Design a protein with these regions (language model features):
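Feature marking well-ordered beta-strand scaffolds used for ligand recognition
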Residues: 32-494
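Bacterial N-terminal signal peptides
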Residues: 13-28
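N-terminal secretory signal peptides that target proteins for export/translocation
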Residues: 1-13
Length: 494
């Protein structure tokens, strides 16, 4: 371009050239984040929507999918209501009800049928609802009623409840463990009846710890012991270690329980001998709390250990020809993001892969995080960062694909066949609806709010369907993998 200012025509040529140059430069810049609109399609790659239910516009936490006779039933725990709508309307009863548990028939995943809402504790957000669900058949429990199906759920933060849901549309309360605070993400072994309950026992120095119960006869719960980190127990002094978030047991066959402490900071992975935990000395002294522990791994203070998902022994492709340690014992850890729009106070939360082959000295060997720039997620509203993974160990996906929720980035399908090199192979970001709630940050002392998807927890079933629920009241999305992601599994082509 020649910058000569002799004539008006040349001036016009210069101006036109500058406009073209500016347009070219802008074309190379990432597009500004667009606020989602009602009616926009979902964003997806190698995953597709099969079915949807709005869950009566309730903020949802944990989906548990249970094969019940010839039916498949989803038991979905809910957070408490919002300040604006503390008791959403249940159109089946015509009554406003505090959030609790949604029971949905997903036998036909394309046409889920809402069966029952079971109200939870009065209260909003974390103070109310009934977030957690686990389900066992009575015929599997050593002392259960063979004709019963048992739902273990939290009741707000105050209790754990057991219901008979053999008729899922008409649950019946069987037992209740109350006098607690801050109950949360528990684990129940159906073959033994041993339950690891995330509880807050008032005498302990921490908000959440573990109560181990024998629920082999759900009508007659028997407490086995209390457990936590030394320094959390009654009568201890000094610094109180990071609170518990949850755990996953491999049962008597694997003889391990993997505990995760910390949500978005101060994370600890704890590997525990299950037999010693259940049958060892019960008094919560520092020595007794240490006795069943095989190994611990302290994470960075910047990240938590929300979900600790044991993958077990895996052959690592790059080590396949090694004569020693070609198999590695792997654990997947997922943190939970808590702060909206990537604001100060929290590091980016993500997923981590831990080699626990030497159980006394586990170590992180890989990580994965959704690239923020791929969707300008920090600008979309709500939380951006990981939250939780599926926990099913059914063969259809186990050690092949993991599904991890990323709040406003939806659910991500991660190829974990080589856990030293995980890679994303698909995603699904649901579309917002009229029910989707806003999320706010403070700007100059005032609320600045955006409506955003907040994909919360995810689970899979043995058939290969993926169930993701939304924290921002959007509902339940039932998905399946397609294309290259599906080829990783043994599922038939779709």
């Amino acid at each position: 371009m020649t910058f000569l200012l002799g004539t008006s025509n040349r001036l016009l040529d210069i101006k036109f050239g500058l406009v073209c140059l500016a347009a070219a430069l802008l074309a190379n810049e990432p597009a500004a984040a667009q606020s989602p609109k009602i009616g926009d399609p979902p964003e997806a790659s190698n995953m597709r929507l099969v079915g949807f239910n709005d869950l009566q516009g309730r903020s949802a936490y944990q989906p548990t999918i249970h094969h019940q006779g010839d039916r498949w039933i989803a038991y979905i725990g809910h957070h408490g209501g919002t300040d604006a709508i503390q008791k959403p309307m249940n159109p089946m009863t015509g009554q406003a009800e505090f959030n609790g548990t949604s029971i949905v028939d997903v036998t036909d995943p394309a046409h889920p049928v809402y069966l029952r809402h079971l109200p939870g504790q009065e209260g909003t957000y974390e103070a109310g609802g009934a977030q957690m669900t686990r389900v066992c058949d009575g015929k599997d429990l050593p002392k259960g009623d063979p004709g019963a199906v048992y739902l273990l759920r939290t009741f707000g933060g105050a209790a754990h409840e057991i219901w008979n849901v053999a008729d899922p549309a008409n649950p019946k309360l069987i037992a209740r463990l109350d006098g607690l605070k801050d109950t949360h993400k528990s684990w129940w072994e159906c073959k033994t009846g041993v339950a690891f309950l995330v509880s807050g026992v008032p005498s302990w120095r921490i908000r959440r710890m573990t109560e181990v119960y024998d629920l082999s006869d759900p009508a007659k719960p028997v407490k086995i012991r209390e457990f936590g980190l030394p320094g959390q127990e009654p009568g201890s002094a000094g610094r109180v270690p990071t609170e518990l978030h949850g755990m996953i047991s491999t049962g008597p066959e694997g003889n391990r329980v993997y505990f995760g402490y910390g949500t978005n900071k101060g994370g600890i992975l704890q590997i525990v001998d299950r037999d010693k935990l259940i049958n060892g000395p019960k008094e919560p002294t520092p020595d007794n709390l240490r006795a069943p522990v095989i190994g611990e791994m302290e994470m960075s203070p910047l990240n938590g250990a929300h979900t600790t998902y044991p993958l077990g022994k895996m052959t690592i492709p790059q080590f396949a020809n090694d004569k020693f340690a070609s198999q590695r014992d792997m654990v997947m850890i997922v943190d939970e993001a808590l702060i909206n729009e990537c604001q100060p106070g929290e590091a980016r939360q993500m997923m981590w892969f831990v080699d626990a082959t030497v159980e006394a000295k586990p170590m992180v060997v890989a990580s994965y995080s959704v690239p923020e720039a791929s969707g300008k997620f920090c600008e979309r509203g709500g939380r951006f960062g990981s939250h939780s993974s599926n926990e099913s160990m059914a063969p259809v996906f186990f050690r092949k694909l993991a599904f991890v929720t990323w709040f406003n980035a939806g659910v991500r399908a991660i190829d974990i066949r080589d856990p030293y090199h995980p890679k994303e192979v698909g995603y699904f970001i649901p579309a917002i609806t009229a029910a989707t709630d806003k999320r706010c940050i403070k700007v100059n002392g005032q609320d600045a709010c955006k409506v955003a998807i907040q994909s919360n927890n995810v689970e899979t079933d043995d058939r290969g369907y993926i169930y993701v629920v939304d924290r921002a009241n959007t509902g339940l999305h039932i998905l399946e993998v397609t294309g290259p992601a599906r080829e990783i599994t043994a599922l038939p082509a779709n």
